[in-house]
Amino acid sequence: MKKVGILVGREHSFPESIINSINEKGAGKVTAEMITVGGIRMDEPKRWDVIIDRISHEVPYYRAMLKRMALEGTHIINNPFWWSADDKFFNFSLAAKIGVAIPKTVLLPQHEYIKDITSESLRNLEFPIDWEGVVSYIGFPAFLKPHDGGGWKNVSKIHSLEELWSEYNQSGKLCMTLQEGIEYDQFVRCYCVGKEKVLIMPYDPSKPYLSGMQYVDVESYLSPELHKRVEQDVITICKALGYDLNTVEFAIKDGIPYAIDFMNPAPDAELASVGEYNHRWVVDNLTNFILRKLEEGFDTADYRWTAMLNPPEKQASVKAPAAKPAAKTARSKKAASK
């Protein structure tokens, strides 16, 4: 029997729904449960075939534990190694190189540093920042936001250089980006499951986050051509990042979908927040993806240590016995021909 574990934070409806869905569709061959962990031994055996991670970005112990589980062959949704290395500024740069429309973005040095960092530690930094050059490239309005974060935290809309200085001076130790503000005609948020299934949701970011009012029910919101492009851009991004579950947000201006946020490996899927249809869609599609991949096999991440854990001689020793019957058959045929 295969086992799926769910690692959760404060959410309630999504974990319950995905557990019930997997247990129902798994038909006794696959079961799902909430994970319970304590002190993890370095030789901890495999306990789950798949773990759905919803909280390790906020709990370092969970992230370290998931990396250890991955070493035993547990498939983590989403990959804890890449999630640890990932950041939004890199994502913007990568997406632009693979043909996705991205608003102009600049990475800014931090305003403050930990106490052990002195001016001597920062001799490679230009000072002061060429603010005029930054603003000339980005323009206004713009958004000042963390290079690594989510949930619309610490995001400010900027309309002038003076406002930029004021907000930047309050950013503390956060590493920030300044991004061109797209005065959009339409806005969509998209679920992507398994790097292939996409749900495009009309979305109003001006409404309170997690309020349940952001998802707008508008029929035929995008033209068929625009719908196809958005869907393809979502798949392109998620394939490049390797995320099995993600959301991608687009600000659409003059028919061009600009991807403004797509590092969401634990996207909101609460019933009260996203609505019944969207909640059910992500639960059903994630369930189907997991069950299918447990039968077919997940794509294996190629880590540098993989070959060391499975060296060629070890693989050959497993296959070697199969050669003996063939040798006997050959000898018997040769003897018969005499």
Language model regions located:
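ATP-binding N-terminal substructure of ATP-dependent carboxylate-amine bond-forming enzymes
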Residues: 1-77, 81-86, 90, 321-338
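Conserved beta-strand segments of alpha/beta enzyme cores
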Residues: 31-33, 75, 101-104, 244
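Generic non-transmembrane alpha-helical segments
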Residues: 25, 98, 236-240
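A short acidic/glycine-rich loop-to-helix N-cap element
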Residues: 271-278
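Active-site nucleotide/adenylate-binding loops and adjacent lid/helix of ATP-dependent enzymes
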Residues: 2-8, 12, 70-73, 81-187, ...
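Phosphate-binding core of ATP-grasp and ATP-grasp-like enzymes
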Residues: 172-175, 181-217, 231-247, 251-258, ...
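Structured loop/turn residues at beta-strand edges in well-structured enzyme cores
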Residues: 46, 100, 138, 243, ...
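A long amphipathic alpha-helix within ATP-dependent nucleotide-binding catalytic cores
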Residues: 210-258, 284-298, 302-319
